């Protein structure tokens, strides 16, 4: 069993709060043995004039975490955001099936990038970081795309696919962190949490 270690003696154990309702991020934290609670951020995400996808995901992750941290200042709050990009075009969650089909046709046979940004907020410290992963799709037939859209899986996913689900059959090659594409670069996160005197790597 993996336990939470807080190294400052005499300090009350701080809760880790995930500022996201994503079932995939929840599953990854559970997989790593990170104890946490969920408080879904209700913040309206706004994308300003940022210079890069990495800036966008880190800013959105920080917006989510900050909104929850306002009422949980004694604890550690995690926020995360994921976007898919292809040739400088940002592919978020599709608004409908037609948009999902357009995105999948665009990604067919091509290499795109997935950025996930993470923000960790505590009373005396804030850390933000991101991971970039390249994903290459096989050439997709219209029948494959239509069948996938009919499953409804792509409708709540950035880029209109879930690499951990049925969308996995579209992936020819991946370079980078698979878990970041799922929604949370869990290995990097565990290491960054050590800056907050939290270590989940010891049994």
From Swiss-Prot:
Catalytic activity, EC: 3.6.1.9
GO biological process, one term: nucleotide metabolic process
Catalytically driven reaction(s): dTTP + H2O = dTMP + diphosphate + H(+); UTP + H2O = UMP + diphosphate + H(+)
Localization per record: Cytoplasm
A GO CC annotation given for this chain: cytoplasm
Sorted UniProt keywords: Cytoplasm, Hydrolase, Nucleotide metabolism
Pfam families: Maf
CDD domains documented for this protein: Maf
Active-site residue numbers: 81
Role, per record: Nucleoside triphosphate pyrophosphatase that hydrolyzes dTTP and UTP. May have a dual role in cell division arrest and in preventing the incorporation of modified nucleotides into cellular nucleic acids.
Family: Belongs to the Maf family. YhdE subfamily.
HAMAP family, alphabetized: Maf
Protein name: dTTP/UTP pyrophosphatase
Organism of provenance: Bacillus cereus (strain ATCC 10987 / NRS 248)
Chain's gene name: maf
